[in-house]
Regions:
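Conserved SAM-binding loop
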Residues: 29, 60, 75-76, 157
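Glycine-rich phosphate-binding loop of ATP-grasp-fold ATP-dependent ligases
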Residues: 149-158
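Short, well-ordered alpha-helix to beta-strand connector turns
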Residues: 24, 57-58, 71, 97
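NAD(P)+-binding Rossmann beta1-loop-alpha1 motif at the extreme N-terminus of oxidoreductases
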Residues: 1-53, 59-62, 89, 110
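Nucleotide donor/acceptor-binding cores
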Residues: 2, 98, 153
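Rossmann-like NAD(P)(H) cofactor-binding subdomain of soluble oxidoreductases
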Residues: 64, 69, 73-150, 165-169
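Structural beta-sheet core signal
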Residues: 6, 29, 100-102, 137, ...
Length: 171
């Protein structure tokens, strides 16, 4: 089973990490917030963004290299305002086997050109770096606290490669 790296431990990233940990996946969360890192490491809970939910077995780091070195699936649970900056940080360490999952809502800045979709901007940056990693988009009317509570919801999972999208959609 591939290790999942969740980049961004806001309420959405944390809720998904919780679900994946409960399903037995090996999850490593990445945050730039010292407060979140300390909370997850000391109490296995993100007291800032998703209080009241223990995340059994999730590791946490503040070093992005830890994620690229030890994870195969990189979940970008980041605000649209910073996701492309983080992708730029990831690119030098990406392996061809890394799968990127884009959870960002909103559009890419107009300076990115193209369709305005964040996933297209990610793919363009990868292509400019000579890389062809698969990018999966996961979106929908999902609410993090409900997902954390186990409420059933729907999400759209899309990728140019249907098999990859189906693999991600399985959980």
């Amino acid at each position: 089973m591939a290790r999942i790296g969740v980049l961004g431990l806001g309420n959405w990233g944390t809720a998904l990490a919780l679900v994946w940990c409960k399903d037995g996946h090996n999850v490593l969360g990445w945050t730039v917030e010292q407060e979140v890192y300390e909370s997850v490491m000391s109490s296995q809970e993100n007291e800032k963004y998703l209080p009241g939910y223990k995340i059994p077995g999730m590791d946490c780091t503040m070093e992005i290299a830890d994620v690229t070195e030890s994870c195969e699936i990189l979940v970008l649970a980041l605000p649209s305002s910073v996701i492309l900056e983080v992708v730029d940080l990831l690119i030098p360490s990406l392996r061809p086997s890394h799968l990127l999952v884009d959870l960002a809502k909103g559009l890419a800045p107009s300076s990115e050109g193209g369709s305005g979709l964040i996933s297209d901007a990610i793919e363009r940056r990868l292509s400019d770096a000579g890389m062809s990693n698969q990018v999966v988009v996961m979106t929908g009317p999902t609410i993090a606290p409900e997902v954390a509570r186990g409420v059933i919801t729907n999400a759209l999972v899309a990728c140019h490669d249907k098999v990859v999208a189906e693999r991600v959609a399985e959980r």
